[in-house]
Swiss-Prot record:
Keywords: Nucleotide-binding. Nucleotide-binding protein. PANTHER family: UPF0234 PROTEIN YAJQ. The keyword Nucleotide-binding applies. One of its GO terms (cellular component) is cytosol. Pfam families: DUF520. Belongs to the YajQ family. InterPro entries: DUF520, UPF0234-like_C, UPF0234_N, YajQ-like_sf. The keyword Nucleotide-binding applies. Gene3D superfamilies: 3.30.70.860, YajQ-like, domain 2. This is Nucleotide-binding protein Acid345_2028. It comes from Koribacter versatilis (strain Ellin345).
Length: 164
């Protein structure tokens, strides 16, 4: 019988992040408490940079951005917040890095959980994804349920279902 497989990945949809940033920017420009505060949100390759006039206003900008990201189904677990630091012109900034791919130690932890479950499935790390294969589709569904119930500190998605 042929093997069935799927990949466990951790990715953020950058188009949805871009849309959320545009919506948050519009709200910042129209909110009374944030007018004339030099508050802005910039999207970089794998990070979001927030600027504002002080920490209180930066926190408000962060809350607006988080609300817009949640509405667009972008997982907040995939974001890592940097420290708030002083910037030029008496402003503060914060960098938020976006998780793209599963880090090595988290991938090893996922593989260990699958192996410890004693299910008849093989898990292997392939770059920044974890491939799980088994002869039985039901076993794969049980593993998906197992992984969803565990908290690895990252957001995981299941993609690339294959039946060979």
């Amino acid at each position: 019988m042929a093997d069935n497989s799927f990949d466990i990945v951790s990715k953020i949809d950058l188009q949805e992040v871009s849309n959320a940033i545009q919506q948050a920017t519009k709200e910042i420009q129209t909110r009374f408490d944030l007018k004339d505060t030099k508050s802005e949100i910039k999207l970089e390759k794998d990070a979001i940079e927030l600027h504002s006039s002080d920490e209180y206003k930066l926190k408000a900008v962060t809350d607006i951005l988080q609300g817009k990201l949640v509405k667009r189904n972008v997982p907040l677990k995939g974001l890592t917040y940097g420290t708030i630091e002083s910037a030029a012109g008496a402003t503060v900034r914060q960098k938020i890095t976006m998780q793209q791919g599963i880090p090595g130690e988290k991938a090893k932890e996922i593989v260990r959980v699958i192996k410890d479950s004693k299910k008849k499935a093989q898990a292997s790390i392939q770059g920044d994804t974890v491939r799980v294969s088994s002869k039985d589709r039901d076993t794969l569904q049980e593993i998906i349920a197992l992984i969803k119930n565990k908290d690895f500190g990252i957001d995981v998605q299941f993609t690339n279902y294959r039946s060979n």
